[in-house]
Amino acid sequence: GVPCLCDSDGPSVRGNSLSGIIWLFGCPSGWHNCRDHGPTIGWCCKK
């Protein structure tokens, strides 16, 4: 999957690890949405 920035990772992608994965059709079972705003396409989810 494509990594994405969770709210807990920090305000920007620079110098922060991307702990989320982008899912186009919502987070799968056992995962949760870890970003309140964005991404534009899909959901940023993590286990």
UniProtKB/Swiss-Prot annotation:
Disulphide linkage map: 4-44, 6-34, 27-45
UniProt main location, coarse: secreted
Protein's cellular compartments: Secreted; Nematocyst
GO cellular component: extracellular region; nematocyst
One protein family per Pfam: Toxin_4
Keyword Signal: no
Keywords, alphabetical: Cardiotoxin, Disulfide bond, Ion channel impairing toxin, Nematocyst, Neurotoxin, Secreted, Toxin, Voltage-gated sodium channel impairing toxin
One GO BP annotation of this record: regulation of signal transduction
Family: Belongs to the sea anemone sodium channel inhibitory toxin family. Type I subfamily.
Function of the molecule: Binds specifically to voltage-gated sodium channels (Nav) (site 3), thereby delaying their inactivation during signal transduction. Thus it may strongly stimulate mammalian cardiac muscle contraction.
Annotated protein name in UniProt: Delta-actitoxin-Axm1f
Species, as recorded: Anthopleura xanthogrammica
